[in-house]
Amino acid sequence: MRIVLMGNGPFAVPSFDAIHSSAREIACVVARPAAPSQGKGPPESPVIVWARQRGLPVHTPISINDADTVAWLSSLKADLLVVCDYGQILKPEALSAARLGGINLHGSLLPRHRGAAPVQWSVLAGDVFAGVSVIHMTPGLDAGPILTSASTRIQTDEDAGTLEARLSQLGVEPTLRGIEMLERHDHPASVPQDRSYATRAPRLKKSDGELHWNYPVRWLDRQIRGLQPWPGVFTHLELPDGKSLRVIVHRATPIESVEVPKFGQVGGLFLPADAASINLSWSDQAIAVIARDGVMVLESVQPSGKRAMSGSEFMRGYARHSGVRFRVPESPQPLLESMMALLTEPEGTE
């Protein structure tokens, strides 16, 4: 079988490498061109780096759907397009450039979490299980029939970066099975997606990372884990001189307790002596911030322009003054509101 691989990020590399090792013919590797940053040349994507290491031809069209690119794809006379983390929706003309169309490895258990950030939204939604799906592609967004899938339990302390690395490995066997199904003309066994269960997984923004301490700790925990390593989460420490310090939060643990808010304002520090009075404790290397229904124990933080440090080291250097408090924005956090809606309102449309 003659295959065109299409992808960009590290999520695609294990499956692409398995296809390459399977002795199938790879006609070309297609990736999106990178934009230059800070006056430097464009960085090459993990897929391009992988392809060049293996001596495979690489093509980086601006749009996969323009007429010239579709004509070029057709000239390759490929049997199948294998797509993963490519970032553009293929129109019918592009899909028809290969004899069997295309399959897509997607980082969720479809139809849940259709979109650009499925792994992150699996964590944000508080899903018990995550997984991968291989679909026979249609022009809709992650809407094609499912050829095969695999699932895994999300660990309670797992962040999106760690989960994505696991899912990229989990996706290898389903991807090979999907190709084999099409080789055997077994794709009638595919399962149409029930769009009444579909949810969206839109691309995340840096502003999604601002912590709003007046939300429940379970939501803050999902936000912190779901946005690691990108775009990351942050808060602002209000300083006695009226200024504020931006603080990145790398790792934190939630503790639910309705008694906690009695000891201070939301966003304030919860002191170990107060915690002991209600039988709560945490590592002496961390600090605890009061939220709506408990505390977030900050274990690793990074003040703006500084290195990462433990919560206790941060407190000694920046939060030693009495009455210090982290900013509590007045407006709702749009990301957290979307997380709440995700649990109750299926997408219902393609």
Enumerate the predicted regions with their spans.
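Conserved nucleotide-sugar phosphate-binding/catalytic loop shared by glycosyltransferases and other
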Residues: 31-36, 43-62
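Internal anion-binding site segments
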Residues: 195-350
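Structural motif corresponding to alpha-helix initiation and N-cap regions
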Residues: 13, 41-44, 66-70, 116
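A residue-level signal for conserved active-site and pocket-lining positions in enzyme catalytic cores
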Residues: 7, 29, 51, 81, ...
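N-terminal Rossmann-like dinucleotide-binding module
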Residues: 1-42
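Donor/substrate-binding cores of folate-linked one-carbon enzymes
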Residues: 21-22, 80-200, 207
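Internal alpha/beta domain cores that form substrate/cofactor-binding pockets in large enzymes
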Residues: 2-4, 27-28, 57-76, 81, ...
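Surface-exposed, charge/polar-rich loops and edge strands
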Residues: 1, 162, 348-350
